[in-house]
């Protein structure tokens, strides 16, 4: 088994290194030199106040991208207008919900976005903090998502609604929520005692069913709910 030996340096001149007990090995000398180069009073940890939410991370994490806003913040760039709160945390007026994916990307280099967050929101933050590699990654993810969505077959929802002639105008006004007429079928007249006959129709309407990236459909609007209620009463 190989043995490690320290190679001693020549004793320091009088007055230099007197408190270190004479000559030092090269390895120990290099370690002491590295410690001497670290600025005194500078902590390894950095506290951020992003939109009222606190984040604690290391300078090494924030300095991953030398061109980013966070790198300049850690370097105390005089051209960067930054303030601190009463706890000493850097104040950043941004959405803390979307800062989480940005910070985690700097920590481990992977983009992880929760299902309740939009890729466009993460892209907005990546551009604000000027993290070029993250910007490219999110844009690629958005293109991939849009490509999958465009390749999905279009589905339609159909409703058959019964209405009288005088209700047709109101029916038309409810079509602006993506619903459109497919067919109008006359089914004769309804007999109202003492009143004129009212022509009745069956209205066939349809709407495209859009899927979200996670396979769920969007919630129907108020107009869509009205149409669905009319169809269910038939």
Curated annotation (Swiss-Prot):
UniProt KW keywords: Acetylation, Cytoplasm, Nucleus
Domain of life from the UniProt record: Eukaryota
Domain BTB: 44-146
Pfam family, one: BTB_2
Signal peptide range in chain numbering: none
Residues with N-acetylalanine modification: 2
Single GO term (MF): identical protein binding
Biased segments, Basic and acidic residues type: 220-234
InterPro entries registered for this protein in UniProt: BTB/POZ_dom (IPR000210), SKP1/BTB/POZ_sf (IPR011333), T1-type_BTB (IPR003131)
Principal location: cytoplasm
GO biological process: proteasome-mediated ubiquitin-dependent protein catabolic process; protein homooligomerization
UniProt subcellular location: Cytoplasm, Cytosol; Cytoplasm; Nucleus
GO cellular component terms, A-Z: Cul3-RING ubiquitin ligase complex; cytoplasm; cytosol; nucleus
Coiled-coil zones: none
Region entry Disordered, spans: 213-234
Subunit structure: Homopentamer. Interacts (via C-terminus) with GRASP55/GORASP2. Interacts with CUL3 and with ubiquitinated proteins. Interacts with CRY1.
Domain characteristics, as noted in the entry: The BTB (POZ) domain is atypical and mediates the formation of a homopentamer instead of a homotetramer. Homopentamerization is due to the presence of 4 residues in the BTB (POZ) domain: Leu-56, Gly-100, Val-112 and Ala-118.
Summary of the function given for this chain in its UniProt record: Its interaction with CUL3 suggests that it may act as a substrate adapter in some E3 ligase complex. Does not affect the function of Kv channel Kv2.1/KCNB1, Kv1.2/KCNA2, Kv4.2/KCND2 and Kv3.4/KCNC4.
Protein name: BTB/POZ domain-containing protein KCTD5
């Amino acid at each position: 088994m190989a043995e490690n030996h320290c190679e001693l340096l020549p004793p320091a001149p009088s007055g230099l290194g007197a408190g270190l007990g004479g000559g030092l090995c090269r390895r120990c000398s290099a370690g002491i030199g590295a410690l001497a180069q670290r600025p005194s009073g500078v902590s390894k940890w950095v506290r951020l106040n992003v939109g009222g939410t606190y984040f604690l991370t290391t300078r090494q994490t924030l300095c991953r991208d030398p061109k980013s806003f966070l790198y300049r913040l850690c370097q105390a760039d005089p051209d960067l207008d930054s303030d601190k709160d009463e706890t000493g945390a850097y104040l950043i007026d941004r959405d803390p919900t979307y800062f989480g994916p940005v910070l985690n990307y700097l920590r481990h280099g992977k983009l992880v976005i929760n299902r309740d967050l939009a890729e466009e929101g993460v892209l907005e933050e990546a551009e604000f903090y000027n993290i070029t590699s993250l910007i490219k990654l999110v844009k690629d993810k958005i293109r991939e998502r849009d490509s999958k969505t465009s390749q999905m077959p279009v589905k339609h929802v159909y409703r058959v609604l019964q209405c009288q002639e005088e209700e047709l105008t109101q029916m038309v006004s409810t079509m602006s929520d993506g619903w459109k007429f497919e067919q109008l079928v006359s089914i004769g007249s309804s007999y109202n005692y003492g009143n004129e006959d009212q022509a009745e129709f069956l209205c066939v309407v349809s709407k495209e069913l859009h899927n979200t990236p996670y396979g769920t459909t969007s919630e129907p609007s108020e107009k869509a709910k009205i149409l669905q209620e009319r169809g269910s009463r038939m």
